[in-house]
């Protein structure tokens, strides 16, 4: 790496678990780019200082992960309309004039993963059921609404939180009582779990799939483990499945292109490398 190397990184607290440095490092090496992508562990009380220093330190930008994705919104000079709508920033880009732009690429990452993982799925093929109403759900619902999904049935343990999401994002969102989540799967062409239930160390998602058509696509945004209990049960009944790793990989593409000037590809080789 030379003195003219372009720099980017990921801001989080903690950040040691992030696969982003491995992911971006793969692309940098593959493309022969003079650059580096660094993990930046930043406590919440130091976030503003670090954000302000990024342009001076020669950074082209950074990814933002938990717990900073909402707090960083008030620290940027320009906010992308989608990031404002979703209510979170996951990508920072230093503009040529040194100002900071906040973007959200999670919706893009989710949708591209779905398209690559199940090319035959069409947004207009029927309703989608979305489980959860956290930050990830906001990106998923925005992506589905923008793609033209006719109805999005949103179920969350806290109905109030689901109702807030629906009001904030608008579009064809129907809030479903948590007790009726299984029944709401009837006629759906897509099921997406946006919660952490099913992740290693967490309990499994309690969801009966009996009402879900066997032709429906089942997507879990969890990727540790790669095949969650939900995906295993869906496979056993014949549903096509899409795992969550691709969302992480695809959401990284726009940021990498903005920082390093080349658009990377999400390949099977990359998937294997990030998982290894």
Swiss-Prot record:
Q: Name the InterPro entries for this protein.
A: Aminoacid_DH-like_N_sf, NAD(P)-bd_dom_sf, SDH_C, Shikimate_DH, Shikimate_DH-bd_N, Shikimate_DH_fam, Shikm_DH/Glu-tRNA_Rdtase
What keywords sit in the KW lines? Amino-acid biosynthesis, Aromatic amino acid biosynthesis, NADP, Oxidoreductase
Where does the source fall among the domains of life?
Bacteria
Q: What class of enzyme is it?
A: oxidoreductase
Question: What is catalysed by this protein?
Answer: shikimate + NADP(+) = 3-dehydroshikimate + NADPH + H(+)
Q: Does the keyword Amino-acid biosynthesis apply?
A: yes
The terms under GO molecular function for this entry are: NADP binding; shikimate 3-dehydrogenase (NADP+) activity
Q: Where are the transmembrane segments?
A: none
Q: What Gene3D superfamilies has UniProt attached to this entry?
A: Leucine Dehydrogenase, chain A, domain 1, NAD(P)-binding Rossmann-like Domain
Q: Record-annotated residues binding NADP(+)? A: 132-136, 221, 244
**What Pfam families does the record point to?**
SDH_C, Shikimate_DH, Shikimate_dh_N
Q: Which residues form the active site?
A: 69
On subunit structure and binding partners, the annotation says: Homodimer.
Q: What function does this protein fulfil?
A: Involved in the biosynthesis of the chorismate, which leads to the biosynthesis of aromatic amino acids. Catalyzes the reversible NADPH linked reduction of 3-dehydroshikimate (DHSA) to yield shikimate (SA).
Q: Any idea what this protein is called?
A: Shikimate dehydrogenase (NADP(+))
Question: Which gene produces this protein?
Answer: aroE
